[in-house]
């Protein structure tokens, strides 16, 4: 999965 993207979005980063 796109952990690099999903993790960032879940962290609330833009």
Curated annotation (Swiss-Prot):
Top-level taxon of origin: Eukaryota
Additional observations: On the 2D-gel the determined pI of this unknown protein is: 6.8, its MW is: 34.6 kDa.
This protein's name: Unknown protein from spot 128 of 2D-PAGE of etiolated coleoptile
Organism classification: Eukaryota, Viridiplantae, Streptophyta, Embryophyta, Tracheophyta
């Amino acid at each position: 999965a796109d952990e690099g993207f999903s993790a960032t979005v879940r962290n609330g980063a833009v």
